[in-house]
Amino acid sequence: MLSPRRTKFRKQQRGRMRGLAERGSTLNFGDYALQATEPCWITSRQIEAARRAMTRYIRRGGKIWIRIFPDKPVTMRPAETRMGSGKGSPEYWVAVVKPGRVMFELAGVSEEVAREAMRLAAQKLPIKTKFISRQEDYI
C-alpha cells in the first residue's frame, strides 16, 4: 500500500474539498483514464484494491499509471476513550480527490479491455467516476 516515507509533520488538519481539481485533470501518460466526478478521500487500501483489479484483468499487457498518492494522514482515537487528551494517532493515509481529477491511466490495450478494467477498478472506489480517452473530450 502507498504511504509517504517521511513527512514534515505527523498530523494534519482535515481541510475542506471545494471546487474542481485545478491540476491533474488531463490525460498525460496513457490513452485511457478513470476520472473522479465527485469529491472524496480515497484511502491507500482502496487505491491498492483498484490497482489489483485492473492488473488482474489486463494481465501481462498494458501499463498502468496511478496519478493520485495518499499523502494525508487520518488520525483516530482508541475506542471508548474519554474526551480530551489530544488528537489521536495516525491510522491510515488518504489521497484528497476533487471532481475532475484523473486517478488512473492505462495504455497498451484495446478500448474494450481498458473500459472493463476501469469498470472493475471503479467498483473498488467509493465515488462516481467517468471513463475518458484521448479521442473524447473531458472536463
From Swiss-Prot:
One GO cellular component, as annotated: cytosolic large ribosomal subunit
Keyword Thylakoid among record annotations: no
Q: Which residues form a coiled coil?
A: none
Entry-linked CDD domains: Ribosomal_L16_L10e (cd01433)
Gene Ontology molecular function, alphabetical: rRNA binding; structural constituent of ribosome; tRNA binding
InterPro entries with a match to the protein in the record: Ribosomal_uL16 (IPR047873), Ribosomal_uL16_bact-type (IPR000114), Ribosomal_uL16_CS (IPR020798), Ribosomal_uL16_dom (IPR016180), Ribosomal_uL16_sf (IPR036920)
Key words of the record: Ribonucleoprotein, Ribosomal protein, RNA-binding, rRNA-binding, tRNA-binding
Keyword rRNA-binding assigned: yes
- Could you provide one GO biological process annotation from this protein's UniProt record? translation
* Matching PROSITE patterns: RIBOSOMAL_L16_1, RIBOSOMAL_L16_2
Q: Family per UniProt?
A: Belongs to the universal ribosomal protein uL16 family.
Concerning PANTHER family, the annotation shows: 50S/60S RIBOSOMAL PROTEIN L16, LARGE RIBOSOMAL SUBUNIT PROTEIN UL16M
Q: What is the role of this chain?
A: Binds 23S rRNA and is also seen to make contacts with the A and possibly P site tRNAs.
Q: How does it assemble?
A: Part of the 50S ribosomal subunit.
Q: Which HAMAP family does this chain map to?
A: Ribosomal_uL16
What's the protein called, per UniProt?
A: Large ribosomal subunit protein uL16
Q: Which organism is it from?
A: Synechocystis sp. (strain ATCC 27184 / PCC 6803 / Kazusa)
UniProt lists the gene as rplP
